[in-house]
UniProtKB/Swiss-Prot annotation:
It holds the Pfam family Bac_DnaA. Its main location: cytoplasm. GO terms for cellular component: cytoplasm; plasma membrane. Oligomerizes as a right-handed, spiral filament on DNA at oriC. CDD domains: AAA, Bac_DnaA_C. This is Chromosomal replication initiator protein DnaA. It comes from Streptococcus equi subsp. zooepidemicus (strain MGCS10565). Residues 329-450 are annotated as: Domain IV, binds dsDNA. Coiled coil: none annotated. Keywords: ATP-binding, Cytoplasm, DNA replication, DNA-binding, Lipid-binding, Nucleotide-binding.
Amino acid sequence: MTENEQIFWNRVLELAQSQLKQATYEFFVHDARLIKVDNHVATIFLDQMKELFWEKNLKDVILTAGFEVYNAQIAVDYVYEEDLIIEQQHQGQQGYTEQAFQQLPAVQSDLNPKYSFDNFIQGDENRWAVAASIAVANTPGTTYNPLFIWGGPGLGKTHLLNAIGNSVLLENPNARIKYITAENFINEFVVHIRLDTMDELKEKFRNLDLLLIDDIQSLAKKTLSGTQEEFFNTFNALHNNNKQIVLTSDRTPDHLNDLEDRLVTRFKWGLTVNITPPDFETRVAILTNKIQEYNFIFPQDTIEYLAGQFDSNVRDLEGALKDISLVANFKQIDTITVDIAAEAIRARKQDGPKMTVIPIEEIQAQVGKFYGVTVKEIKATKRTQDIVLARQVAMFLAREMTDNSLPKIGKEFGGRDHSTVLHAYNKIKNMIGQDESLRIEIETIKNKIK
């Protein structure tokens, strides 16, 4: 990269970072690379699914940087992984092609090609799991073996498993890789037992370079001791030959109660990492990414509203977008307002429809009356102990009892940021679990509001 190219690219990144939220920047911009600037055309390498975001949101950034560095209007040519690899192959370098993929008849990897590290949204709740997964993909069998990823459903464990496999396969098309759920491993074991072909099963799994097992907790069943024995031997064969093993579970190794102790011990030989539900910023980034797949306009307040409604896992967010798409297509509308989104997701919300008819002002008034403070004080910045508690309780109830997004709630509390509302909500939620008197106070206020 020439000096001007480096200056230009640094300026693009600087401007992008100043305009985007951190989680959005990390996902859409961080991994992009400038290949060259030639004849006033910047060639930028990025994941293909991110091109639309760049076209919509970063065109002005590139124009600004272009005029600053080259005193010219810079056009953009986006190239994707496939383009670069084809170019490398023409230069005699090793690369991944569909033909190379098909030259591995001995092992069907069963990887899902749509999952990669590039399209995995990172946040504080999964950063260590992502870092460990990338480390394993870069040096399989040497860094963390096994890698054990645990967390609730819909948080990205399967995505990371496939991303590891796809990354390894990209670097080494001849790698023997197998992705399989523990349930399917059990099914294969039963079939081979019935057919008296256990040697085939052993050859299939014990000669792998990378074994990716999803939902290993399914193996923890006392009635399947024979399956545990086979997996134990498979694990040993791979580990002894420095072949990488990655496991996912909905619980820690120590909580796999029906699994043999010798397996649990081996699962803890390497690294155990946890994935927790995404925070608000990460959910916004996930939605910003996912809506690129839909031909609708999602205003920012709608995105933030949706991010505030589902805080347990990514699947709920994906399901909500499908519900919205169905309603929007039926009504033949292009722009998804908060009202349309609320109507579409009402049946999906785990706790049922919230009481959208309750004004936030009513909540503030009842909370203020209970704690002896005014609504004006609740909305202001004064931080005496009684006012702070009343303010946080009011925010908590606004989140619990209405469909309003976190930013909308913050606006009703003197223009506060959504992160302040989220902090108040989490704080009161935790306090309720520890302070019975506070729980009773809040229930009393809720009954008055209803």
